[in-house]
């Protein structure tokens, strides 16, 4: 099975209600990220999903520009991310390291 197919299958299991456009963007992010090349398909799908949500659907980057450190910015967007994960049918809980 090709890497793309493995990540797609992992993402479908992880986020069964994710919209098609978002699905493609998350898979592309997982494949394009140098840091995820050696990750298991499941970890690549999860880490890419979390990163995509944080950057595309929250004020995370704005908080960083306002001078918040990474951990503080992540704290302030966590509830918004949890709500989106729930909408997309994700059962896995967002951890403090995510």
Regions found by a protein language model. Give the residues of each.
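Structure-specific DNA junction-binding interface
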Residues: 1-98
